[in-house]
From Swiss-Prot:
Substrate binds at residues 71, 144, 151-152, 184-185, 258. The gene is Scd1. Keywords: Disease variant, Endoplasmic reticulum, Fatty acid biosynthesis, Fatty acid metabolism, Iron, Lipid biosynthesis, Lipid metabolism, Membrane, Metal-binding, Microsome, Oxidoreductase, Transmembrane, Transmembrane helix. Belongs to the fatty acid desaturase type 1 family. CDD domains: Delta9-FADS-like. PROSITE patterns: FATTY_ACID_DESATUR_1. Stearoyl-CoA desaturase that utilizes O(2) and electrons from reduced cytochrome b5 to introduce the first double bond into saturated fatty acyl-CoA substrates. Catalyzes the insertion of a cis double bond at the Delta-9 position into fatty acyl-CoA substrates including palmitoyl-CoA and stearoyl-CoA. Gives rise to a mixture of 16:1 and 18:1 unsaturated fatty acids. Plays an important role in lipid biosynthesis. Plays an important role in regulating the expression of genes that are involved in lipogenesis and in regulating mitochondrial fatty acid oxidation. Residues 9-33 are annotated as: Disordered. The histidine box domains are involved in binding the catalytic metal ions. This is Acyl-CoA desaturase 1.
């Protein structure tokens, strides 16, 4: 990328909204009583993704698991198709491999920059062309429509590590990775998720349009298009197009996202808040284009970078900053360095380089 373009993108940092916590005078006593997850957040329009420390699981045995056999069978078949796709990769044309990488990155951004940082957390704002791109990319990813994805994710933050958390990591690696999609939702997930304020997404026509036409959209964008393009445009075999460009690519995107829910809640350091389960996991960040700095993200869910370090192993932040340089993204929320360091000192596990 040309140096002047990098300079333009870097200078666009000055347009971010810096979030600080400046208690002084009589306010100091008030701040002591404010839950840590609320102290630094100044977003008046979004509170549904902030952890609720008052919520506790009800005592008693958990409900019996109800398996969703349709999901189990489809998930097994998909992963078998993905494994077969790995075997076929050496026989693929170079264009097919490059197209698969492009489709992976685009659909991943539909989750990370779209469903996650834009629509779940409102960490930045996007103009219509960017929102259209992200809604298409999100449909390519096929991980439920934006509305449902954001509702589950807000519940995950607000009721993290409880039965109201859709992919509660306290129930083990397999459950938080994929098992939660193979069983009926816990009653607490339905109850608490149904009470979340989703009015911001209900008011967004593009999100509701995607929700209304999601099934035909996902069939076209996730399965039909990535199969037909290599087959028709450069003469790839239909089998390679189907199993590599479609099944393998889709399987990889799914598992990269799921690792944020599983591995990044079980393995890694907790430099920002040792009292929560989410961890910093560099390997997860590599696959999930920047989503592995999870202890930071759960500590500061309102930071558009989902990380203290902006572009470091964080392609999603680089993408958002490029969009800002083009005038398509704006009002990016960024936690101040002073606030981050203060939080590290208060609740970190001592693993941060500043400790």
């Amino acid at each position: 990328m040309p140096a002047h373009m990098l300079q333009e993108i870097s200078s666009s940092y000055t347009t971010t909204t810096t979030i600080t916590a400046p208690p002084s005078g009589n306010e100091r006593e008030k701040v002591k009583t404010v839950p840590l997850h609320l102290e630094e957040d100044i977003r008046p329009e979004m509170k549904e993704d902030i952890h609720d420390p008052t919520y506790q699981d009800e005592e008693g045995p958990p409900p019996k698991l109800e398996y969703v056999w349709r999901n189990i069978i489809l998930m097994v078949l998909l992963h078998l198709g993905g494994l077969y796709g790995i075997i076929l990769v050496p026989s693929c044309k170079l264009y097919t491999c490059l197209f698969g990488i492009f489709y992976y990155m685009t659909s991943a951004l539909g989750i990370t920059a779209g469903a996650h940082r834009l629509w779940s957390h409102r960490t930045y704002k996007a103009r219509l062309p960017l929102r259209i791109f992200l809604i298409i990319a999100n449909t390519m990813a096929f991980q439920n429509d934006v509305y449902e994805w954001a509702r589950d994710h807000r519940a995950h933050h607000k009721f993290s590590e409880t039965h109201a958390d859709p992919h509660n990591s306290r129930r083990g690696f397999f459950f938080s990775h994929v098992g939660w999609l193979l069983v009926r939702k816990h009653p607490a997930v339905k109850e608490k998720g149904g009470k979340l304020d989703m009015s911001d997404l209900k008011a967004e026509k593009l999100v509701m349009f995607q929700r209304r036409y999601y099934k035909p959209g996902l069939l076209l964008m996730c399965f039909i298009l990535p199969t037909l393009v290599p087959w028709y445009c450069w003469g790839e075999t239909f089998v390679n197009s189907l199993f590599v460009s479609t099944f393998l690519r889709y399987t990889l995107v799914l598992n990269a996202t799921w690792l944020v829910n599983s591995a990044a809640h079980l393995y890694g350091y907790r430099p920002y808040d040792k009292n929560i389960q989410s961890r910093e996991n560099i390997l997860v960040s590599l696959g999930a284009v920047g989503e592995g700095f999870h202890n930071y993200h759960h500590t500061f869910p309102f930071d558009y970078s989902a990380s203290e370090y902006r572009w470091h192993i964080n392609f999603t932040t680089f993408f958002i900053d490029c969009m800002a340089a083009l005038g398509l993204a704006y009002d990016r929320k960024k936690v101040s360095k002073a606030t981050v360091l203060a939080r590290i000192k208060r609740t970190g596990d001592g693993s941060h380089k500043s400790s």
